Regions:
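Short, charged phosphate-coordinating catalytic segments
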Residues: 1-26, 118
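Active-site/catalytic core of tyrosine-dependent DNA strand-transfer enzymes
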Residues: 17, 25-28, 50-95
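Short basic/aromatic active-site micro-motif
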Residues: 76-79, 95-114
Length: 163
């Protein structure tokens, strides 16, 4: 979530163990920056990072001036973040996307890679696995893939039914 990203501090990122601790959320109200609790209780979580992202974050933190471990790593507003993404998409000649679209794409990718809805819900901070199930429509071939895997399993065990 945008607010979770924009609330991150150096203290929240452990590049050695490749984790991010999500414990707060950023918002702006009446021109003032506010750091509060994440959207739901399940939003508070520790997310495992792939190596490439841990390395990118490490390089970013080293590039920045010596950040106070309590200062936001990305000290800009949601508007600025979305506007930057919009501009980048335009320059790249691709369809405009929102930050939330990246979250949606991440869930879709994890579903396609075969991760369980429960594991994805934990990673995304979904309050309920039912929220994760909203993405199921994105993969209409999953039913066919399941049937093919079951066929392969039965054939490998020599238990296929022949006529």
């Amino acid at each position: 979530r945008e607010g979770e990203l924009l609330a991150l501090t150096a203290k929240d990122i452990d590049t050695k163990n490749r984790t991010i601790s999500v414990t707060k959320s950023y918002s702006r109200l009446n021109g003032r920056d506010i750091i509060g609790k994440p959207k739901t209780k399940k939003s508070e979580r520790v997310i495992a990072l792939p190596r490439f992202l841990a390395q990118e974050l490490q390089e970013y933190m080293e590039m920045e001036r010596e950040p106070n471990e309590n200062e936001r790593l990305f000290p800009f507003t949601k508007y600025a973040l979305n506007n930057t993404l919009k501009t980048a998409a335009k320059l790249a000649g691709v369809k405009e996307i929102r930050v939330h679209d990246l979250r949606h794409s991440h869930v879709s990718l994890l579903i396609n890679l075969g991760f369980t809805a429960v594991a994805i819900a934990d990673r995304m901070g979904h309050e309920s696995v039912h929220i994760t199930y909203r993405y199921a429509h994105l993969f209409p071939n999953q039913q066919r893939n399941m049937a093919d895997v079951l066929d392969a399993l039965m054939n490998a065990r020599g238990e296929g039914h022949e006529r």
